[in-house]
UniProtKB/Swiss-Prot annotation:
The lineage of its organism: Eukaryota, Viridiplantae, Streptophyta, Embryophyta, Tracheophyta. Belongs to the bZIP family. Homodimer. Binds DNA as a dimer. Interacts with floral glutaredoxins GRXC7/ROXY1 and GRXC8/ROXY2 in the nucleus. Interacts with TGA1, TGA2, TGA3, TGA4, TGA5, TGA6, TGA7, TGA9 and PAN. One of its GO terms (molecular function) is protein homodimerization activity. Residues 161-181 are annotated as: Basic motif. Residues 159-203 form the bZIP domain. Induction: Strongly induced by flg22 in leaves. Pfam families: bZIP_1, DOG1. Coiled coil: none annotated. PROSITE patterns: BZIP, BZIP_BASIC, DOG1. A motif (Nuclear localization signal) lies at residues 163-170. SUPFAM superfamilies: Leucine zipper domain. It is found in: Nucleus. It comes from Arabidopsis thaliana (Mouse-ear cress). This is Transcription factor TGA10.
Length: 460
């Protein structure tokens, strides 16, 4: 019993000495437990040759042998640790700091680490290679916060007024995209038509085209002037072909507008069809402006119209005031404000028509006076003086005749303004019925002309 107590006391003293020795090694920054087991085998072999005074006790030798048996065998001798144990890692890495600060002190087993040290090494090694869980949790928490903030940005109000306003905004955005798409398609179709028209003009001027059984743009001349059917120029013939295409496109657009009106579409959707028809009419105004610069007589004569339409022709087109009378009965019921606006528009349109008619009449009278000779020259008068008098009168008449183009352009401008001002006074559905009524009016005039030309004729 006393021997056992003495051995235990000797073991504690040896442990304290070893602990102080371990602290000394910890201060130097290295741990003897990190030394390769081969070194312990070497030192153990040297211990058998030491004098008996320095030989370790049997109990110490037993613990050393047990620790060596628990360490895994290795084939290399690595007496230097992977990194100094006393170096503190940077504060940014929390998990590495915790693993480094676990500097094991010497255990009571002597100069070697206890049996629990290998498990500690394995635990630290696994913690070193294990990905940081804190950053993942922080990232997940940040994602949850981001989702919460994004959910917070989405209005979750149950107010009916707010929900209705949001629905209206979405519907308006959708209609805006549809209008933009239709506008782009219209621009593309206009570009294609313009390219085709330019190609036809070049082909008509270079090769000549057949129109109504006669050659246009070729070498047919009369008095040094190129002629076609009815003495029209090549530009006028191209305008007639383009006008025929315009009529076909107008019929297609009106059919779409009629279907849209019958389907009871919304105001925004119906507005798209109305704007398309108005833009198509503006295209005709541009075509007439181009041909007016080259052959204004073709527009005034109405050669591009049907016979029944020529009876109502006024300065190369229809009278705007007559169109207002046609559509008034087709767009009822009207409000009091609309009736007042339409009456005022009709009165101002009639005044403008009267002013243009008086101006054109004055121009015709002046033109007639310019070409009338003051007196007939005598039969014995020489030809050159008579020819010079003729050329002076023709030059004066040409200067006055150039104003005829301005009258036609002003009349087309009045027609354009009347239609657009009338549409401003009406609702979208009334505008649609207005366009359909005008188209039906001209369609009946064209049908009347066809019936007149196809009527049976009596001989004699």
């Amino acid at each position: 019993m006393q021997g056992h107590h003495q051995n235990h006391h000797q073991h504690l003293s040896s442990s304290s000495a070893t602990s102080s020795h371990g602290n000394f090694m910890n201060k130097d920054g290295y741990d003897i437990g990190e030394i390769d087991p081969s070194l312990f085998l070497y030192l153990d072999g040297q211990g058998h040759h030491d004098p008996p005074s320095t030989a370790p006790s049997p109990l110490h030798h037993h613990h050393t042998t047990q620790n060596l048996a628990m360490r895994p065998p290795t084939s290399t001798l690595n007496i230097f640790p992977s990194q100094p144990m006393h170096i503190e890692p940077p504060p940014s890495s929390t998990h590495n700091t915790d693993n480094t600060r676990l500097v094991p002190a010497a255990q009571p087993s002597g100069s070697t680490r206890p049996a629990s040290d290998p498990s500690m090494d394995l635990t630290n090694h696994s913690q070193f290679h294990q990905p940081p869980q804190g950053s993942k949790s922080i990232k997940k928490e940040g994602n949850r916060k981001g989702l919460a903030s994004s959910d917070h940005d989405i209005p979750k109000s149950s107010d009916p007024k707010t929900l209705r306003r949001l629905a209206q905004n979405r519907e308006a955005a959708r209609k805006s995209r549809l209008r933009k798409k239709a506008y782009v398609q219209q621009l593309e179709s206009c570009r294609i038509k313009l390219t085709q028209l330019e190609q036809e003009i070049q082909r008509a001027r270079s090769q000549g085209v057949f129109f109504g059984g006669s050659l246009i743009g070729g070498d047919q001349q009369q008095g040094g002037l190129p002629i076609g059917p009815g003495n029209i120029s090549s530009e006028a013939a191209v305008f007639d072909m383009e006008y025929a295409r315009w009529l076909e496109e107008q019929q297609r657009l009106l059919n779409e507008l009629r279907v849209a009106t019958q389907e009871h579409l919304s105001e925004n959707e119906l507005r798209m069809f109305v704007d398309t028809c108005l833009a198509h009419y503006d295209h005709l105004i541009n075509l007439k402006a181009m041909v007016a610069k080259t052959d204004v007589f073709h527009l005034i004569s109405g050669a591009w119209k049907t016979p029944a339409e020529r009876c109502f022709l006024w300065m190369g087109g229809f009278r705007p005031s007559e169109i207002i009378k046609v559509i008034v009965n087709q767009i009822e019921p009207l409000t009091e404000q609309q009736i007042v606006g339409i009456c005022g528009l009709q009165q101002s349109t009639q005044e403008a028509e009267e002013a243009l008619s008086q101006g054109l009449e004055a121009l015709n009278q002046s033109l007639s006076d310019s070409i009338v000779s003051d007196s007939l020259p005598p039969a014995s008068a020489p030809l050159p003086p008579h020819l010079s008098n003729f050329m002076s009168h023709m030059s004066l008449a040409l200067n006055k005749l150039s104003a005829l183009e301005g009258f036609v352009l002003q009349a087309d401008n009045l027609r354009h303004q009347t239609i657009h001002r009338l549409n401003q006074l009406l609702t979208t559905r009334q505008e649609a019925r207005c366009l359909l009524a005008v188209a039906e009016y001209f369609h009946r005039l064209q049908a009347l002309s066809s019936l007149w030309l196809a009527r049976p004729r009596q001989d004699g």
